[in-house]
């Protein structure tokens, strides 16, 4: 009786596009397509999302992140010297998608990935939860130039404790 069975995070790339196709055609799901624009969209990705939506007749929700804040955070992470410099963008993706799902009572989030290109064995020192709001804010406080007013945040506790055990 819900409008959507799940949310699918879509970038416009092959992995999330293929996942969307399989979810709709093979598993007969009713996904809401969720896209986060953090300022790095290519025209090809935007065109791919449009074609996917048209072909599969799906709805799209796009969250646009404040580019100046994304830029400032990314520069702060570069200046900090940590190896996981892509955290600001990943953090925004997961924060917005999980919060949207939570507040719209959508219980499942699907994301596309590719083991052959995204799961190269990195040194353990490089591994870090992108959902660590405290580290994100600490790095920004030390190396950022602007105040974060609109940047979406989330925390490990919200993901690992609240959502699985306390969400009603």
What is each model feature region?
Residues 7-15:
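Short, glycine-rich nucleotide/cofactor-binding loops
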Residues 14-19, 92:
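Short glycine/serine/threonine-rich phosphate/pyrophosphate-binding segments
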């Amino acid at each position: 009786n819900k409008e959507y069975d799940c949310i699918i995070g879509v970038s416009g790339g092959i992995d999330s596009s293929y996942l969307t196709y399989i979810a709709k055609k093979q598993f007969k799901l009713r996904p809401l397509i969720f896209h986060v624009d953090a300022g790095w969209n290519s025209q090809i990705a935007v065109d791919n999302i449009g074609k996917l939506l048209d072909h599969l007749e799906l709805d799209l929700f796009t969250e646009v992140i404040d580019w100046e804040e994304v830029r400032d955070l990314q520069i702060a992470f570069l200046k900090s010297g940590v190896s996981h410099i892509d955290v600001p963008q990943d953090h925004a993706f997961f924060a917005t998608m999980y919060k949207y799902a939570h507040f719209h009572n959508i219980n499942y989030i699907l994301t596309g990935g590719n083991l052959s290109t995204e799961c190269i064995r990195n040194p353990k020192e490089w591994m870090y939860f992108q959902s660590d709001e405290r580290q994100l804010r600490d790095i920004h406080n030390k190396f950022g130039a602007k105040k974060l007013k609109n940047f979406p945040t989330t925390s490990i506790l919200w993901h690992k404790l609240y959502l699985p055990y306390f969400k009603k």
